[in-house]
């Protein structure tokens, strides 16, 4: 029997919802003068966290690793420039597979230089409010 494996795994409704969420995140950080950075997903070093497993990519010049988080690269940027940054892009974790976990996922990570934990809590609240706009947009948008 012929299988329709070529069909997308995601509905148009989910694609539109994700696009709106991503756009609102980018607009939020742009309005707050936080610079988006596009970082490499391949690195010559892996994560130092013993509870996170990286994917290894075999390369003729040596093994490379898919990033599990943008943290290290972002902290290097901040140390050099003292500027606020965010990353919205792909990350990979080899051990996280299941109904609610995909080894490839979209991650949002940001750093503020002159904010304390209370400022960040307020910012998270504002971000969630802006992104959700009172809707249940968090449901099944993966």
Residue ranges and their predicted role:
Residues 1-119, 129:
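Class II aminoacyl-tRNA synthetase-like tRNA-binding/catalytic domains
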């Amino acid at each position: 029997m012929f299988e329709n494996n070529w069909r997308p795994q995601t509905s148009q409704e989910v694609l539109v919802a994700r696009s709106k969420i991503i756009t609102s995140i980018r607009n939020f950080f742009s309005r707050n003068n936080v610079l988006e950075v596009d970082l490499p997903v391949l690195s010559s070093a892996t994560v130092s966290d013993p509870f996170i497993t990286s994917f290894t990519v075999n390369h003729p010049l040596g093994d490379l690793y898919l990033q599990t988080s943008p943290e290290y690269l972002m902290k290097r940027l901040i140390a050099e420039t003292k500027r606020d940054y965010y990353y919205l892009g792909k990350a990979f974790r080899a051990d996280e597979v299941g109904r609610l976990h995909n080894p490839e996922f979209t991650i949002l990570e940001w750093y503020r230089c002159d904010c304390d934990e209370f400022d960040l809590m307020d910012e998270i609240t504002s971000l969630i409010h802006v992104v959700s706009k009172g809707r249940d947009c968090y449901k099944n948008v993966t």
